[in-house]
Curated annotation (Swiss-Prot):
Induction (UniProt): Up-regulated in hepatocytes by pro-inflammatory cytokine IL6 and down-regulated by anti-inflammatory cytokine IL10.
Membrane topology label: Multi-pass membrane protein
GO MF annotation, one: arachidonate omega-hydroxylase activity
A GO BP entry: prostaglandin catabolic process
Annotated TM spans: 15-35, 87-107
Compartment(s) of residence: Endoplasmic reticulum membrane; Microsome membrane
Disulfide links within the chain: none
Reaction(s) this enzyme catalyzes, per UniProt: (5Z,8Z,11Z,14Z)-eicosatetraenoate + reduced [NADPH--hemoprotein reductase] + O2 = 20-hydroxy-(5Z,8Z,11Z,14Z)-eicosatetraenoate + oxidized [NADPH--hemoprotein reductase] + H2O + H(+); leukotriene B4 + reduced [NADPH--hemoprotein reductase] + O2 = 20-hydroxy-leukotriene B4 + oxidized [NADPH--hemoprotein reductase] + H2O + H(+); 6-trans-leukotriene B4 + reduced [NADPH--hemoprotein reductase] + O2 = 20-hydroxy-6-trans-leukotriene B4 + oxidized [NADPH--hemoprotein reductase] + H2O + H(+); prostaglandin A1 + reduced [NADPH--hemoprotein reductase] + O2 = 20-hydroxy prostaglandin A1 + oxidized [NADPH--hemoprotein reductase] + H2O + H(+)
Enzyme type, top EC level: oxidoreductase
Chain's role: A cytochrome P450 monooxygenase involved in the metabolism of arachidonic acid and its oxygenated derivatives. Mechanistically, uses molecular oxygen inserting one oxygen atom into a substrate, and reducing the second into a water molecule, with two electrons provided by NADPH via cytochrome P450 reductase (CPR; NADPH-ferrihemoprotein reductase). Participates in the conversion of arachidonic acid to omega-hydroxyeicosatetraenoic acid (20-HETE), a signaling molecule acting both as vasoconstrictive and natriuretic with overall effect on arterial blood pressure.
Reported cofactor(s): heme
Name under which the protein is recorded: Cytochrome P450 4F4
Entry EC number(s): 1.14.14.94
Length: 522
């Protein structure tokens, strides 16, 4: 019988058997892996084929660059949603598929999935990680769930109620500046610049109980936050600088690191100062003292909160949540309020109706301050805010990467691991959901017109388990600022129409410019 001759390998048969067995096992394992990955790829590809695709540039580029962060890109989105009202699939290059959903019936499956199934896809937010850490915006899984439960009391109406006074004060400071600038009859103002400072002023008081007077004089901390936001938006558009090691070598990378350090040092100093005061005061004493001053700030709540096991948040966790609130709370509200004023400037009949509603509310008062109970007494103003958030949502897209297959109501499957975009802008401009979607019509939000509409047709604050925890805070601030603005100023459109610019939030190229006229001069 012929024998296997391995002498040319320098091996004898009896000594080579273990090696042959090991080689066979390794080859079998590799074959199984290859076959498994091939099956997964084939199965994923089959599911992806169920989603319609716009025409590609070519096989290599796919749809890369088809939707740009510009006015033209948003117009392209409105064309796509008119053609594919349920959603569509695109390829970034030859191998990265992205599913975009833009109809309430299909986005429900993703937004209603648990936070452990529909993970936030951080590819669009990863540049914020060195600044915001593992705050609610960027964290996932058990940590996110735990922190969400612990932070929910911070947004209870008992905590939010005293903040209305802060919103009034910060808006008054902004308006005093406007009155000076418009002393000649009117002033042309960049709403983003002015309102961003106002929202940061409010947030610094609500989060830290700190008044930097940033609307009237430069503040290092506030300037650092504005710089960080601008640098992140700029980096997002520079593909070569998406690599951290390369970005750190650039001038902007060094600026980002310096601004990050300044912001962290400020937050850490506040936390450590409050932490040192805690051992000398009982928790009940702190709460009673704060109750007398009628304000419990965000840092207070974070320091006092405990999970189900009585465990407190670490200083690092508190810093991450405070920095996240400062970032998310100023940009989104500034965007929303700026576009609201723009829409009311273009529709003076709605602006005047809002103004009359505010005047009627404050008719018999000596003070023109908006109070907590007033916020529910401004129905038409609220309708105008919501219609502007529909037409110009501050956050235009959110992203998820699911840890398991998600089955849509029509039977199609979003495969595990595929990036899924919930396009808020497209959903809000979907003609099958909103007739004449490009028209600004506040009466869409009349109670009679809301009854038969899906709650997921309007999602400026997202929806489901990962919806915006601060949406009531944001709506309250916008109501106060808008009511006082319309009470004191007439807002007029600029000669030049703004060009929308979707970054982390919806901006306008070169700023959003409007003219304001003090009503006392009319």
């Amino acid at each position: 019988m012929p024998q296997l001759d391995l002498s040319w390998l320098g091996l004898r048969l009896e000594t080579s058997l273990p090696w042959l067995l090991l080689l066979l096992i390794g080859a079998s394992w590799l074959l199984v892996r290859v076959l498994t990955q091939t099956y997964i790829f084939y199965r994923t590809y089959q599911h992806l084929c169920d989603f319609p695709q716009p025409p590609k540039w070519n096989w290599f580029l796919g749809h890369l660059g088809m939707i740009t962060p510009t006015e033209q890109g948003l117009k392209q989105v409105t064309k796509l949603v008119a053609t594919y009202p349920q959603g569509f699939m695109t390829w970034l290059g030859p191998i990265l598929p992205i599913i975009t959903l833009c109809h309430p019936d299909v986005i429900r499956s993703v937004l209603s999935a648990s936070a452990s199934v529909a993970l936030k896809e951080v590819i669009f937010y990863s540049f914020l990680k060195p600044w915001l850490g593992d705050g609610l915006l960027l964290s996932d899984g058990d940590k996110w769930s735990c922190h969400r439960r612990m932070l929910t009391p911070a947004f209870h109406f008992n905590i939010l109620k005293p903040y209305v006074k802060i919103f009034n004060d910060s808006t008054n400071i902004m308006h005093a500046k406007w009155q000076d600038l418009a002393s000649g009859g009117s002033a042309r103002l960049d709403m983003f610049k002015n309102i961003s400072l106002m929202t940061l002023d409010s947030l610094q008081k609500c989060v830290f109980s700190f008044d930097s007077n940033c609307q009237e004089k430069p503040s290092e901390y506030i300037s650092a936050i504005l710089e960080l936001s601008a640098l992140v938006a700029k980096r997002y558009q520079q593909l070569l600088l998406h690599t951290d090691s390369l970005y750190q070598l650039t001038h902007n990378g060094r600026r980002f690191h310096k601004a990050c350090k300044l912001v962290h040092n400020f937050t850490d100093a506040v936390i450590q100062g409050r932490r040192r005061a805690l051992p000398s005061q009982h928790e009940d004493d702190i709460l009673k003292a704060k109750a007398r001053s009628k304000t419990l700030d965000f840092i207070d709540v974070l320091l006092l909160t405990k999970d189900e096991d009585g465990k407190e948040l670490s200083d690092e966790d508190i810093r991450a949540e405070a920095d996240t609130f400062m970032f998310e709370g100023h940009d989104t509200t500034a965007s929303g309020l700026s576009w609201i004023l723009y829409n009311l400037a273009r529709h003076p009949e709605y602006q005047e109706r809002c103004r009359q509603e505010v005047r009627e509310l404050l008719r018999d008062r000596e003070s023109t301050e908006i109070e907590w109970d007033d916020l529910a007494q401004l129905p038409f103003l609220t309708m105008c805010i919501k219609e502007s958030l529909r037409l110009h949502p501050p956050v235009t897209v959110i992203s998820r990467r699911c840890t398991q297959d998600i089955v849509l109501p029509d039977g199609r499957v979003i495969p595990k691991g595929v990036i899924c975009i919930i396009n808020i802008f497209a959903t809000h401009h979907n003609p099958t959901v909103w007739p004449d979607p490009e028209v600004y019509d506040p009466f869409r939000f009349d109670p009679e017109n809301i009854k038969d509409r899906s709650p997921l047709a309007f999602i400026p604050f997202s929806a489901g388990p990962r919806n915006c925890i601060g949406q009531t805070f944001a709506m309250n601030e916008m109501k106060v600022a808008l009511a006082l603005t319309l009470l004191r100023f007439r807002v007029l459109p600029d000669d030049k129409e703004p060009r929308r610019k979707p970054e982390l939030i919806l901006r306008a190229e070169g700023g959003l410019w409007l003219r304001v006229e003090p009503l006392s001069t009319q």
